[in-house]
């Protein structure tokens, strides 16, 4: 039986979205506590119950920690960017928590991780959005990331 693996950075991105979601939902600003909770979940594959038997999940701990720390360090700038991309009829206070968490992490990686090509960031987070958000929100994520990439001259 062959072993299947998912890219470690892809898992780190999902885990970072989960950590930031937890931060927002629990109003918990203890970054180390949040990171430890999420890491312990991923380090114990037994806690993930609906995986195929031969699928191995592991994440890039360094990429995960870098993403979460960068979001915490830049949270006000990230929220300002997100809010500036909302249409006039959208109230930032009513943005779904999961959408805000995904946008915080994805925009953070787009802006503060110059080693990751913009196209990769956009594709990865659009794929993550496909698994977590509704169709309208997926399009919004793709549109916002594309605009930010172009605004910051990291052309695709």
UniProtKB/Swiss-Prot annotation:
One of its GO terms (cellular component) is cytosol. Keywords: RNA-binding, Transcription, Transcription antitermination, Transcription regulation. GO terms for molecular function: RNA binding. The keyword Protein transport does not apply. GO terms for biological process: DNA-templated transcription termination; transcription antitermination. Pfam families: NusB (PF01029). InterPro entries: NusB-like_sf (IPR035926), NusB_fam (IPR011605), NusB_RsmB_TIM44 (IPR006027). Transmembrane segments: none annotated. Signal peptide: none annotated. Involved in transcription antitermination. Required for transcription of ribosomal RNA (rRNA) genes. Binds specifically to the boxA antiterminator sequence of the ribosomal RNA (rrn) operons. NCBIfam families: nusB. This is Transcription antitermination protein NusB.
């Amino acid at each position: 039986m062959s072993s299947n693996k998912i890219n470690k950075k892809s898992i780190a991105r999902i885990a970072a979205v989960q950590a930031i979601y937890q931060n927002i939902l629990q109003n918990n600003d203890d970054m180390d506590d949040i990171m430890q909770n999420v890491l312990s979940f991923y380090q114990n594959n037994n806690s993930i119950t609906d995986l195929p038997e031969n699928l191995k999940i592991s994440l890039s701990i360094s990429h995960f920690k870098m993403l979460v720390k960068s979001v915490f360090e830049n949270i006000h700038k990230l929220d300002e960017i997100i809010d500036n991309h909302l249409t006039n009829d959208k109230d930032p206070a009513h943005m779904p928590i999961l959408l805000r968490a995904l946008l915080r992490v994805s925009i953070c990686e787009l802006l503060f991780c110059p080693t990751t090509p913009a196209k990769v960031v956009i594709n990865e987070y659009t794929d993550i959005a496909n698994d977590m958000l509704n169709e309208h929100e997926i399009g919004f994520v793709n549109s916002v990331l594309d605009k930010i990439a172009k605004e910051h001259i990291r052309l695709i």
